[in-house]
Amino acid sequence: MEDLKSYETRVIEINEVDDMGEYFFHHLLNRFAQIATESAMKLGVWNYDMMSKYGWVVAKQYLHLDEPIHYQDCIELSTTISKGTYVSFPRYYYIKKDNRLIGTCSSVWTLLDSQKRRMVSPQKIGITFPEAPLEHLLEL
């Protein structure tokens, strides 16, 4: 199931924190979007040819942190998918610091037709998601 996961390790920089040294949430969400895009490309559910026609958008997202992330913290972000429905697909993110899980995020993504501004089933445009058993969620 390793191919269902994507990772990024980074050290938090000064321009990513507030005046108290805590990581801005919008930077965290941007990193999530980046690793989700890399993951989608790796899984074959998004490519650059789709850019002007279709786009994956977050319909709902929930973030939980057990502790704040600070300037110069080294964090590992990871993401994976789970089984979806006809038009919505869950994605999970994990935040580790010092090899400890300090946060999680869950999101629901839908595919939009950019011209029609409507949800579209990925199957209708030839996208097939890989099987994603729930057991692999525990391995992150």
Predicted segments — roles?
Residues 39-88:
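Hydrophobic beta-strand-centered segment that forms part of the acyl-chain substrate-binding groove
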Residues 16-18, 69, 85, 99:
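Residues that cap or initiate secondary-structure elements
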Residues 77, 81-122:
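Hydrophobic alpha-helical segments and helix pairs
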Residues 1-58, 104, 111-140:
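Hot-dog-fold acyl-thioester-processing enzymes
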